[in-house]
Each structure stands twice: as C-alpha cells, then as structure tokens.
C-alpha cells in the first residue's frame, strides 16, 4: 500500500539469528518493484514482530516488548515511513509483568497473534487467549469491548479473527481460524469457526467447518486449519489448510458452511507432506498459495 512493503522479522527457536540481527519491522519503498529499498527498520524487544496488517498508513502489529510476557497489540503510524511512531498499544491483563501484573497462564500461551482492523474496531487473535475485540475510535487508547477464549476445552490456539465486511442474513459475522499447532493435548485437527458478533459485547460461536475425512482421532500437528484469506471479496473464503492444501469455503448459508472447491499441491521436494501456510487473492481473482516448507502456487477459481 502507498508503494510501501512491510516485512516482519522474528527469531524462531530453531533458527536463531546471528549476533546483531534484531527482531522488528522492516519498511521498504517498492515504488520500483524490481528494486525494493529499505527505508528504515523499526526494532522491538524479545523475538520481534510475529505478524501484522497494514492499511496504507497505520500498521497493526504483534511485537514482543520489554517488560511484557508474549506479544502485545501495537499501532504504528507510518505517515512518515522513515520515522514510525507508536500511536497506541493494548495488552491482555497479566502480560505487563514490569508493571506488577501477574499472568494467570503459563509461559507465552496468551499472546497477540495479529490484529485486523474494520472500521473503528480491531479484531485480535490471541493464541490460547482466544480473541478480543477492541474499540480503536481513539487509536491512542484501544479499549476492550469483548473477548472469548475456548481453549480449553478446545485444544488449538486462535490464529485469525477475521470480520466479514458485509452482513450475512442480517447478522454480523466473524471468522475465527484456530491453528493446528501448540495443542493443549493430543486431539483432532483445528477447524474454522463462525461467530455471531451482531451484539459485539456478546460474541456467540454458531457454526464451524472441518474438511471431510476427519473422524476426531488425534492427528499430527500441521494437519488442520491455518489461515483464511484476509481479503474477503464475497462469500467464498479461500483457506490455507496445512496438509489439506487450499480449501474454498462458502459461507453464504452461515449456519451450514460448505466446501465448494479445493486444490492439493504436490508434496514439495525434501518434505513428507504438503503444508499450505498462507493464501491471498489479488484484484484479478488470482490466488497465491504458499507452502510452509517451500513453493508458491498461483491459482484461479474455475
């Protein structure tokens, strides 16, 4: 957006960065796409920034910050991309240990995965803390509206909280994708939820979608749901479904979501199975499906 490209940098336990390489957010000028130029690098503490969304001016990010346990919500103003300015932040009570708070959970189980903005609300996935809805009418003071945490009893963490930008049968609906990793116990793969947020103070899960052939028996991680396309153009939602490839789910009848198309890539060389990680759609309707191991497929709906 606005000829800017943002790239998160994050240290992973299995792939520690070399000395001197920090986590944060890289900001690039891509007005000449073949010659991207780094404008600046915004640094943060801990492992860095896990994921983000960007509307052309504000970046809604999930950084680790000194004094906090796990990633928090932060809003950066990139009006001057050479000087990113923090506008506001929010964290789940218990994360700010430097401020005297004590988490009610162990480790980094409750942490911001990433925020998605629609209007004056942020819809924030919070891993094993479920999801929260924040009022950002005043960007400097994000305010808690509501939240819902279903793990436990469900065993997988929430990866994406994605509001549908149009009503379905007169109701406001949010999609919630749980990620098939970091399970609280052995169990069946994660799936996609539909949540009624017509009364946003009282979100109500009312439907779900799981791929066919799942019988409830325990499966390895990276089998189930991961990420829905965060650009919604209609009721057909492309979803990256790890070992099951790309699934296109029609939510036109929200109480009965159904699969209308799918694509299973070939297993990448050097890997034992498919691991479809992310999917995006461009203005032409082309789909871009990335494998977590290696490879990119460009697809069209027929």
Map each language-model feature to its residues.
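Feature marking well-ordered beta-strand scaffolds used for ligand recognition
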Residues: 1-302
């Amino acid at each position: 957006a606005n000829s800017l490209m943002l790239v998160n940098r994050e240290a992973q336990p299995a792939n520690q960065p070399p000395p001197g390489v920090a986590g944060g957010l890289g900001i690039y000028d891509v007005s000449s796409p073949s010659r991207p130029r780094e404008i600046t690098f915004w640094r943060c503490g801990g492992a860095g920034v896990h994921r983000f969304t960007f509307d052309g001016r504000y970046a809604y990010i999930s950084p680790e910050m000194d004094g906090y346990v796990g990633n928090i919500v932060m809003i950066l103003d990139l009006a001057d991309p050479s000087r990113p300015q923090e506008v506001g932040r929010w964290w789940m009570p218990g994360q700010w240990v430097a401020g005297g708070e004590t988490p009610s959970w162990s480790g980094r189980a409750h942490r911001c995965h990433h925020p998605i903005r629609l209007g004056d609300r942020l819809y924030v996935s919070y891993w094993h803390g479920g999801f929260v809805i924040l009022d950002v009418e005043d960007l400097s003071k994000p305010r808690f509206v509501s939240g819902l945490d279903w793990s436990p009893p469900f065993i997988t963490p929430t990866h994406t909280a994605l509001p549908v930008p149009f009503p379905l049968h007169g109701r406001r609906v949010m999609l919630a994708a749980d990620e098939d990793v970091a399970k609280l116990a052995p169990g069946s793969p994660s799936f996609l939820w539909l949540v009624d947020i017509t009364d946003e103070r009282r979100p109500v899960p009312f439907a779900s979608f799981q791929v066919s052939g799942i019988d409830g028996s325990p499966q390895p991680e990276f089998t189930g749901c991961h990420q829905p396309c965060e650009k919604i153009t209609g009721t057909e939602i492309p979803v990256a479904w790890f070992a099951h490839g790309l699934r296109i789910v029609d939510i036109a009848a929200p109480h009965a979501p159904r699969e209308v198309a799918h694509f299973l890539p070939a297993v990448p060389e050097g890997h034992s199975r498919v691991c479809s990680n992310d999917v995006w759609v461009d203005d032409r309707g082309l789909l871009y499906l990335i494998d977590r191991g290696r490879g990119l497929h460009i697809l069209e709906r027929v």
